[in-house]
């Protein structure tokens, strides 16, 4: 085959890295898997996150082998998965947003700022993470047929499809230089967008810290 369709994914990754200000960008199928892959790479242990965030964030930490702790505080746009240099950036997408030496995870859900429909992205300056994430997102291989590569690491089915990447490239063509964060208020009911996750049985044993 003359052209690998996953070249479109690479083009989208390059576009997002240039826009956000990171050296590298690794596309995934959603922000949750981006967080899980990054957490796996960091070998997280105890991770502190806000008590009000999206349900899958603490689950991604647990799947990566970490323990979740909650803290009561308000956040806007992004927050850190403390004490690691890992940021949930699902509600922010603006030029130059990348924090040097960090790992920032984006969302392209239909309700997010770049509404591809589904998709996520890891922003990083760490070349070793690029190798790990690009292989692990695609079942341990590069974007080739399985008989054309050696599978040396454990991976997941967490890659972005060329179709999603093509839509992302199209939307970025007219995306503004600066965009405001998505607010954490439910516009329909004028109440907090996220419930307190400590009320769910899954997280009832998670410690709350100050």
Where are these regions (language model features)?
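PLP-dependent aminotransferase-like
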Residues: 39-98
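Active-site region of PLP-dependent enzymes
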Residues: 93, 103-210
């Amino acid at each position: 085959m003359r052209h690998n369709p996953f070249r479109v994914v690479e083009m989208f990754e390059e576009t997002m890295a240039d826009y956000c200000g990171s050296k590298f960008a690794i596309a995934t199928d959603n922000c949750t898997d981006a967080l899980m892959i990054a957490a796996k790479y960091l070998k997280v242990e105890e991770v502190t996150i806000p008590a009000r965030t999206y349900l899958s964030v603490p689950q991604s930490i647990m799947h990566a082998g970490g323990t979740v702790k909650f803290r009561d505080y308000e956040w806007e746009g992004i927050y850190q998965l403390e004490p690691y240099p890992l940021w949930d950036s699902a509600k922010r997408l603006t030029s130059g947003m990348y924090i040097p030496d960090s790992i920032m995870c984006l969302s392209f859900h239909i309700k997010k700022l770049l509404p591809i429909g589904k998709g996520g992205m890891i922003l990083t300056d760490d070349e070793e993470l690029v190798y790990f994430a690009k292989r692990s997102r695609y079942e341990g291989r590069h974007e080739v047929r399985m008989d054309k590569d050696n599978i040396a690491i454990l991976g997941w089915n967490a890659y972005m499809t060329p179709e999603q990447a093509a839509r992302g490239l199209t939307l970025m063509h007219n995306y503004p230089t600066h965009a405001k964060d998505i607010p954490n208020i439910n516009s329909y009911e004028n109440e907090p967008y996220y419930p307190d996750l400590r009320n769910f049985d899954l997280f009832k044993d998670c410690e709350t810290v100050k």
